[in-house]
Amino acid sequence: MGLETEKADVQLFMDDDAYSRHSGVDYADLDKFADSGSDRDPHRLNSHLKVGFEDVIAEPVTTHSFDKVWICSHALFEISKYVIYKFLTFFLAIPMAFAAGILFAILSCLHIWIIMPFVKTCLMVLPSVQTIWKTITDVVIAPLCTSVGRSFSSISLQLSHD
């Protein structure tokens, strides 16, 4: 139990024969991990999802748990986050990708074959509608507004103090 002044790196060490090297993550050396494969998020769509232990669990300076408890909870957090993510992606990634593919195919089809032809048709018809609307405005609405304006402009009020 003590005051920590530096951010500690977490590493999980296991024997090579008991654990596969390709399924473990070395959190202390992120540069090696990032360069090991192709970038799966080149446009940084999920850069806000990088949640660390310190972002979730934080102890104020005045109250600290035992160092061993802090280290074990940190390791358990990282391992559970890693294992649960792998488990969920194993069962959900393919069905979700399939559903997203179907959804985007439907949206693309609707956009290409229904929405854009409708928009183009409206844009072709709009000049005719604009001409008709201008005629209705000039024939009906403009004289009506002019008459009402002249009627109200002839009204005068005089106030007297009695």
From Swiss-Prot:
UniProt keyword Lipid metabolism, yes or no: no
Molecular function terms from GO: D1 dopamine receptor binding; protein heterodimerization activity; protein homodimerization activity; protein kinase binding; protein-macromolecule adaptor activity; scaffold protein binding
One Pfam family of this chain: Caveolin
Record GO biological process: basement membrane organization; caveola assembly; endoplasmic reticulum organization; endothelial cell proliferation; insulin receptor signaling pathway; mitochondrion organization; negative regulation of endothelial cell proliferation; negative regulation of skeletal muscle cell proliferation
Post-translational modifications: Phosphorylated on serine and tyrosine residues. CAV1 promotes phosphorylation on Ser-23 which then targets the complex to the plasma membrane, lipid rafts and caveolae. Phosphorylation on Ser-36 appears to modulate mitosis in endothelial cells. Phosphorylation on both Tyr-19 and Tyr-27 is required for insulin-induced 'Ser-727' phosphorylation of STAT3 and its activation. Phosphorylation on Tyr-19 is required for insulin-induced phosphorylation of MAPK1 and DNA binding of STAT3. Tyrosine phosphorylation is induced by both EGF and insulin (By. similarity).
PROSITE patterns the record matches: CAVEOLIN
InterPro entries per record: Caveolin (IPR001612), Caveolin_CS (IPR018361)
Superkingdom of this protein's organism: Eukaryota
Function (record text): May act as a scaffolding protein within caveolar membranes. Interacts directly with G-protein alpha subunits and can functionally regulate their activity. Acts as an accessory protein in conjunction with CAV1 in targeting to lipid rafts and driving caveolae formation. The Ser-36 phosphorylated form has a role in modulating mitosis in endothelial cells. Positive regulator of cellular mitogenesis of the MAPK signaling pathway. Required for the insulin-stimulated nuclear translocation and activation of MAPK1 and STAT3, and the subsequent regulation of cell cycle progression.
Subunit structure: Monomer or homodimer. Interacts with CAV1; the interaction forms a stable heterooligomeric complex that is required for targeting to lipid rafts and for caveolae formation. Tyrosine phosphorylated forms do not form heterooligomers with the Tyr-19-phosphorylated form existing as a monomer or dimer, and the Tyr-27-form as a monomer only. Interacts (tyrosine phosphorylated form) with the SH2 domain-containing proteins, RASA1, NCK1 and SRC. Interacts (tyrosine phosphorylated form) with INSR, the interaction (Tyr-27-phosphorylated form) is increased on insulin stimulation.
Family: Belongs to the caveolin family.
Protein name (Swiss-Prot/TrEMBL): Caveolin-2
Gene: CAV2
